[in-house]
């Protein structure tokens, strides 16, 4: 055993588990493409001030959870990305995407990094898949993005999910609500934990996101942002709910839902699973019209998006028995080398078979024929092809059906034709 271990908060994804990740990723690729979204890939690290301005200086992510470093003493600080949206918007602005077309539908699958206390479904290096719709934030656009997320979960077969929605209004409405929250929580300062006391001064909306059991009754009685909304914001939210109802997407209005990032406005949403504990969210998102201006745009750019935590998603899929027994596709053919001096010839055959689109395997360790046959059966090969001196001389090879034990002598061309005609993927 090596004296080296993976860093705390990280983990290895070995080949069998990697198949599960590919299963989930391929579903997301498929569903996102159905909705017209195209993949974007951004760097794993960005300048630190991108996240400070984009996510918000008062958030826990910026204040406590970022991995930042300064590679050049005279240069700017760099941070491993803790979330994807700011980087996607930066890429859109830098590359003038919205000047090329007024609407962009983008999706991503990527790794992120946060200094969190490692626990089930929450690591310091983790993965998200998500989508961003840039250029439009009408109620129809918001419903489109939410539909994509719920369609993805449905395609995986998930049950027991709750879609929670809320409206955070516009900046003016949130300012009035912030003042109301400060007035409400201030007399109860002594009841607040240290984190909530800090949030009371910087951003009291974050108190609503507290999971501290001792504060839940106090939070439940707090003023509702909904009561500070003006008619335009109310109409916008009601139209989003109308579209969800039209699409037969069930939802619950949660007036305490604020999400953990400062750039959200108007509609915010979150999906939770009854398979998880207190940390029950597996995905969420919302509108973020002002993010572009925070990153240097001359104007706001309407936008809406979501992200799904893939580690938590896999936990739920496993608990609901939706991952099944997924294995790598077996080779169609296992080439059995009868004498080691025939290895070069066998390698040429395998090269030809693979170029012909036939998954083929052979032994590179010089094992006995008996050991090679055991390996062929272990891998689930459909056929074994025997390569020895007499076969090489005649140009015909023994092809054995490992299910029926029937064996026939065929040329390599006939072997390839048989496999193409009678063996499906």
UniProtKB/Swiss-Prot annotation:
Subcellular location per the Swiss-Prot or TrEMBL entry: Cytoplasm
Catalytic activity, reaction form: tRNA(His) + L-histidine + ATP = L-histidyl-tRNA(His) + AMP + diphosphate + H(+)
Predominant location: cytoplasm
Pfam (any one): tRNA-synt_His
Gene3D superfamilies: Anticodon-binding domain (3.40.50.800), Bira Bifunctional Protein, Domain 2 (3.30.930.10)
Enzyme class, broadest EC rank: ligase
GO MF assignments: ATP binding; histidine-tRNA ligase activity
EC numbers on record: 6.1.1.21
Highest taxon listed in the record's lineage: Bacteria
Any one Gene Ontology BP term: histidyl-tRNA aminoacylation
Listed GO CC annotations: cytoplasm
UniProt keyword Transport, yes or no: no
Keywords associated with the record: Aminoacyl-tRNA synthetase, ATP-binding, Cytoplasm, Ligase, Nucleotide-binding, Protein biosynthesis
InterPro entries: aa-tRNA-synth_II, aa-tRNA-synth_II/BPL/LPL, Anticodon-bd, Anticodon-bd_dom_sf, His-tRNA-ligase, HisRS-like_core, HisRS/HisZ, HisRS_anticodon
Family: Belongs to the class-II aminoacyl-tRNA synthetase family.
Family annotation (PANTHER family): HISTIDINE--TRNA LIGASE, MITOCHONDRIAL-RELATED, HISTIDYL-TRNA SYNTHETASE
Assembly description: Homodimer.
Name of the protein in its database record: Histidine--tRNA ligase
